[in-house]
Amino acid sequence: CMFYAFTNGTLIDEEFCKDMQRLGNISLALSVEGFEEVNDSRRGSGCFEKVMHAMDLLKEHGLIFGTSICYTSKNYKTVTSDEFLDMLIDKGVRYAWYFHYMPVGNEAATDLLLTPEQREYMYHRIREIRGFEANLCI
């Protein structure tokens, strides 16, 4: 039995990784929404650096982990670019969950919603990635 947990990764440290190794049946999906500038604009200053450090620790401890990516009208091409995917693979990411942005609440940013054309692009691009990226399950 395997358990998956979604996290921003900011509290992952050596002790946490050792606990994950001891348990042996948990995999984390770390939230990332692009490279540093875009990620930190949505998740807070310094989050990108913290999640990259968390990925390094998880990889060093031989733990299987992935990423959770919320794509928007602003980042959809970046988070499906070869450069971004190569970075994730180099960091040790083994799978990626892609979620389209859904505005929630009274002050949600509706400008981040994808257009029908952008959604179609994502539909085809994710299938293309699935066919070529042998080291990453999407």
Question: What are these language model-derived features?
Answer:
Residues Y101-I138:
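A C-terminal junction/extension of Radical SAM enzymes
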